[in-house]
Swiss-Prot record:
Species of provenance: Mus musculus
Modification comment: Phosphorylated on serines by CK2 kinase.
Localization per Swiss-Prot or TrEMBL: Nucleus; Cytoplasm
Transmembrane parts of this sequence: none
Gene Ontology cellular-component annotations: cytoplasm; cytosol; nucleolus; nucleoplasm; nucleus
InterPro entries on file: CA109-like
Residue ranges of coiled coil: none
Keywords associated with the record: Cytoplasm, Nucleus, Phosphoprotein, Ribosome biogenesis
Keyword NAD: no
Protein known as: AFG2-interacting ribosome maturation factor
Taxonomic classification: Eukaryota, Metazoa, Chordata, Craniata, Vertebrata
């Protein structure tokens, strides 16, 4: 079985990585859900600010005794908006941690593969077994997942960094723009991969054993 050792090392790295992907995917999804009401709050504040700007307070008799009311109202609304932006920044930091954690674990898998690539039989790398996709497929899927999180994070970071109170229309459109990022992505990528590797994760050593049996059958 010594000739199987390099394959076993790579498979073990894969088995450690996919559960991390699943855990981080759950954190990613819950964080995105946390962002939705915050984005709606910002959108509503922008709508209120726009309504207040279009109202001529001096034309309302009941408001004339309060000449600074419009400015005080605007300040309060902007302060409330800044509180929401701070909360969104915290959620964005969590998304960055997810992206970095997945990237780090994917890199570890590829380091394990590259360290043993010279002695790995290419047919073994390309061949699936009864319980496992091929190592080549699983490596490709991890690359896809890593790119997915990297791209999604950058799009969301760019969207939030573009917020400024001088463009109230864009702030009102934030919830739709945020959701559009998800709609443009393959929303089942990670879950589909996790289903595909589920038996592999449940059968430690199963792939090497199966491959060995195929050699000797």
């Amino acid at each position: 079985m010594a000739h199987d050792q390099p394959l076993l090392v790579v498979q073990e790295a894969l088995r450690k990585c996919f559960p991390v992907v699943e855990e981080q995917q759950n954190l990613w999804q819950s964080t995105l859900q946390d962002c939705s009401p915050l984005l709606s709050s910002l959108s509503n504040l922008a709508e209120q600010l726009q309504a207040a700007q279009s109202l001529r307070f001096e034309d309302v008799p009941a408001l004339r005794p309060f000449p600074d009311l419009q400015e005080r109202l605007r300040r309060k609304q902007l302060e409330a908006g800044d509180v929401v932006l701070d909360k969104l920044a915290e959620r964005l930091a969590t998304l960055l941690k997810v992206r970095n954690t997945i990237n780090s674990h994917v890199e570890q898998v590829f380091q394990a593969y590259e360290q043993h690539a010279a002695v790995l039989d290419i047919d073994t790398v390309l061949r699936p077994s009864v319980v496992s996709p091929s190592v080549a497929d699983m490596l490709e899927w991890l690359q896809d997942i890593d790119r997915h999180y990297g791209s999604s994070y950058l799009k969301r970071k760019y969207l939030l960094s573009s917020i400024h109170w001088g463009d109230l229309a864009s702030i009102q459109a934030l919830p739709k723009a945020w959701d559009q990022i998800s709609e443009n992505e393959c929303q089942t990528l990670v879950s589909d991969v996790l289903v595909s590797v589920s038996f592999f994760l449940e059968e430690p050593g199963g792939c090497a054993a199966s491959g060995d049996l195929e050699h000797h059958s």
